[in-house]
Amino acid sequence: MLEKIIRFSLKHRWFVLLFTLVIAILGVYNFQRLPIDAVPDITNVQVQINTQASGYSPFEVEQRITFPIELAMSGLPSLDYTRSLSRYGLSQVTVVFKDGTNIYFARQLINERLQEVKDKLPPGVETTLGPISTGLGEIFMYTVTNKPNVPISQHYNPTELRTIQDWIIKPQLRNVEGVAEVNTIGGYEKQFHITPDPSKLVRYRLSLNDVVEALERNNANVGAGYIETNGEQNLIRVPGQVQNMADIENIVIASFEGTPVRIRDVAEVALGKELRTGAATENSKEVVLGTVFILMGENSRTVSERVAAKMKDINKTLPEGVEAITVYNRTTLVNATINTVKNNLLEGALLVCVILFLFLGNIRAALITAMVIPLSMLLTITGMVENQISANLMSLGALDFGLIVDGAVIIVENCIKHLAEQQHALHRVLNLEERLKVISYATTEVIRPSIFGVFIITVVYLPILTLTGVEGKMFLPMAQTVIIALLASMLFALTFVPAAVAIFLRGHLQEKENWLVHYLSLGYAKVLRRCFHARRVVISAAVALVVVSLGIAFHLGGEFIPSLDEGDIAMHAMRIPGTSLTQAITMQDLVEKRIRQFSEVKNVFAKLGTAEVATDPMPPNVADTFIILKSRKKWTNPKKTKPGLVQEIESAVQQIPGNNYEFTQPIQMRFNELISGVRSDVAVKVFGDDMDTLLKTAEAISAQLKQVPGAADVKVEQVSGLPLLTVEINRDVLARYGLQIGTVQEAVVIATGGKKGGELFEGDKRFDIVVRLPESLRSDPNVLRQIFIPLPLSKDGEQHFIPLSEVASLIRSESPNQISRENGKRRVVVTANVRNRDLSSFVSEAKKRIDGQVKLPSGYWITWGGQFEQLQSAYQRLQIVVPITLLGIFLLLFISFGKVRDALLVFTGIPLALTGGVFALWLRGIPLSISAGVGFIALSGVAVLNGLVMITFINKLREQKKVYLKDAVLQGSLARLRPVLMTALVASLGFVPMALATGTGSEVQRPLATVVIGGIISSTFLTLLVLPGLYYVFHGRRKKGQSKSEPQEQIM
């Protein structure tokens, strides 16, 4: 089959070149369609169920809303687990499905279950589903603010800015292709407030509810069918909707002593502010912040660019003096990451080409070999587009051009050798027919081991396809891309390379060693003889190195995946529970002023509390602060590191009392939270029933965690300390007055929280009309006690009132700030970040300390979460994958040689290669990670290539030329020096830029590249120095029947 392909490629060589050109053009076309991102989206399939329940305490939210919804979600197909959050007035249940579940199918299932549970929820409570987005969903953020050169007198107030955002900017952005949602926080939603005067209401014998009912009865348009007159149909409408504030003021509530009482007689009508749950700040001033969420499955770079382009158009339509400023754009990170990958690949390709020129000694031959790189990449891009693989840090992170050209190198090198030998034998330049025949023979001679080597590397990556969860989403694209690239290189090695050699390698050819190969050969011959004669010592030393590396590996420590340096900082600021939103904004202003003193900081903005869509519900006392940094080139001290800057910022803001902080990065923060429900590297989850016991146990665990070296930002989840003002109604007194509890509740709700009585339309815009007491009265507890409660009408039809204090008392108390649950069980989380230490050793030490020092009450237990949870899952999976990979390699080697002995000989390249990888990590101070683990998997395939080539050649010498064992070993080793060095150098140098890069995203690629480079170096030494001796030892015994006089050694 392979021979037929080669003969076809040579016979129709110009067609092959034309076909190659078509593939290249297709690749260029697909490059325009290739989705580009920073990293793969590793978020699990999840749906958020948000329920607003105004006035409900966390206990009531948990009991009446969260628990019924959790119960309804039980038993859903493909359900993984549920977790929930119950806060004052808000329930959020997150339903996590198994990987591969269709998000639209999952949402359909949840909607069906919500319909079933609807009747069990409190009246008036409605559930909504979160946007169809992921942890990487927040791709674009912008602030709506006044232009800096506009006089303060002409500034738009926060309510007007919010109106511009809600009715001008947001609708246009939601129409951008690929946008799932535009979330808003900050400013105030515009409302029309009717603020009654309690004394006037009493004077006219009216209640607060009378005002609401009057508004509801006088603010509607109705249709009354139609009539037919003279053969014409006339529709009948009865408009009654209010058009402006004057219409509201003129609404008649009732008649008092024969005179109509209008709303204007008992209340003021004016523009008002909503009772908001969140705010936004930028550089110590309040702003309106919009966040664009990408639709799941869309490409973030493309959608970000569309949003940015649309934002430019929108800015042209905004009112004079207002602008929307981009404060966060994912494209910046994507471009920086892709630039790092691009530079690594280009530098790697350049290094590979240099090695090809040096070793092949023929410009045309080197160019033919080098052409396989861009051709394979273009075909790989086509494969990525067809398989919906985005180009990102991980998918392109393991591409090694050295491996891609390996097959082509072997073929071209063998063709040059045979062409030169044939020309030398005939003493003339070969004609076309002779050249094609030699090229066909030379290619066929090495194509099987060459293809087999590529096949081994491909098989090595196949087990990575079995990874699941976060590690699967991270490394699956990498394995798929490498496999596609290797298959592409195999195709071009079979077709393009022989055709190109036949066309371009004409004229007189000489296979001569250049100066580099000549001197390397001389030096290698001397070292080889010494190592061969001291082979047992050399083999023993190699075994000792393997043993030492095992000891080092156990002390390297471990982490899940090296954190991608996103370039910016996310700071989670927490104040005392119960801190008002107004006070939190004041404290946030101080924090931002302190942060802006650092010259490295470009911009600071923050989200406080919960936004319009509760994708990330936070209480008012908590703020997510985004610190956007300048380019590293613009830092006053370029030597300063980002961790160093974080420590300086932390020291500065810690001086502001009443705040606690934890530092992370924007994407990392959302990933951690959405995947495991926490925002930190490590989480200790304490499960149980009683909140006080949970909190006490969590505090004890926190105290122990703080003593572990490397612990930072250790804190217990804020679950207590929410101040409540409870209106405790006396049922006995209520009964004496003949009142219903609902009457009292309604009066309090309208007075303090306000009640919507209708809407006022301004063109396409619509705004709520709300009835509540004036701000100066509703915030005063003493006034609250004096709220008038309407009594049932007396016998003479008179309306009388009593103050609230007659039937109820106000009681101050504390409530849980929030109640978190996981799989239906309450939990409290202790979180910590790990700095200047690897994750694995930190958790190991923390576990020992907690197990020894903290006694858990009966019925309570702990689990470890955060990134450590993902690390453990990945390690368990790799414990299965790695042995299967090694077994697969051995079976392939056995199939190749047909002998266990030779298969074992080549297989020995893997332990010493892994040794080099471990030493390389140890020398660079890099802990073991899933990235390094994938590097070891890839290395195990690369490690056997050189051994495969050398053993195959030595066996060939012994079988075909009947060379004695020692001569065969030494001659075969020397003859294979150039291909072994070329393979090793091109494979390792292709990874050098990744190992040394410092750009955005380089930290993720560094462990993998370091492992491969270190492993290839040690594997090359094994192949050149240890393997010859091993071969002699393995094959040195005389076979039965062999003559004793037959020489076993011959002087070289």
Swiss-Prot record:
Query: Would the keyword Ribonucleoprotein be found if you checked this record's keyword annotation?
Result: no
Using the UniProt record, give the first listed, main subcellular location. Answer: membrane
Protein localization:
Cell inner membrane
Q: Which family does it belong to?
A: Belongs to the resistance-nodulation-cell division (RND) (TC 2.A.6) family.
Q: Which residues cross the membrane?
A: 14-34, 121-141, 348-368, 369-389, 393-413, 450-470, 483-503, 537-557, 878-898, 903-923, 934-954, 979-999, 1011-1031
Mode of membrane association: Multi-pass membrane protein
Q: What is this protein called?
A: Protein HelA
**Annotated function:** Presumed to function with HelC and HelB in efflux of an unidentified substrate.
Q: Which organism is it from?
A: Legionella pneumophila
InterPro entries linked to this entry:
AcrB_DN_DC_subdom (IPR027463), Acrflvin-R (IPR001036), CusA-like (IPR004763)
Q: What NCBIfam families does the record tag this protein with?
A: 2A0601
Q: Give GO MF terms, alphabetically.
A: monoatomic cation transmembrane transporter activity; xenobiotic transmembrane transporter activity
